[in-house]
């Protein structure tokens, strides 16, 4: 059906526990700290989508749910893409990696991933989340490879 609701995929926002997986060694931040120092109750803090009024460790304001990113990785991959030879599998490129949700999804789905992030804080959060994802079971049962390369940003 053209234009119907069945064309849409819905998933809830990433929970605080999902946002913070792999970040156990980072300090807990208040919503004000996560939004750049706004005070509780000030204009903008209550409606700020990235904070939702909860304490957490991930300072990134728009962490995507892993379930949504896994869905998009599968939808964007060509049929038959899961070749036993990892070198022949699709590559997911995320030029603005943020907190690394797309990379985590790619690892879990068993496809290759290249991510770039200029923001040092976000790059560190993404690195920690990707290291945590390294231990997650993948769809194909093989272990992913994470590489860190210096420069202006970080490449995973």
Spell out what each predicted region is:
Residues 1-156:
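Class I S-adenosyl-L-methionine
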């Amino acid at each position: 059906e053209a234009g119907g609701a069945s064309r849409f995929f819905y998933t809830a926002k990433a929970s605080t526990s999902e946002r913070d997986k792999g970040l156990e060694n980072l300090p807990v931040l208040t919503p004000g700290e996560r939004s750049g120092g706004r005070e509780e109750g000030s204009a903008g803090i209550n409606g700020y989508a990235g904070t939702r009024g909860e304490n957490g460790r991930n300072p990134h304001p728009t962490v995507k749910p892993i379930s949504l990113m896994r869905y998009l990785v599968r939808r964007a991959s060509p049929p038959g893409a899961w070749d036993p030879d990892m070198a022949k599998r699709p590559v997911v490129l995320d030029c603005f990696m943020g907190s690394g949700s797309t990379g985590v999804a790619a690892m879990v789905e068993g496809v290759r991933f290249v991510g770039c992030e200029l923001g040092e804080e976000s790059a560190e959060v993404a690195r920690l989340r990707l290291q945590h994802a390294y231990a997650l079971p993948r769809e194909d049962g093989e272990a992913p490879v994470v590489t860190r390369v210096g420069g202006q940003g970080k490449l995973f």
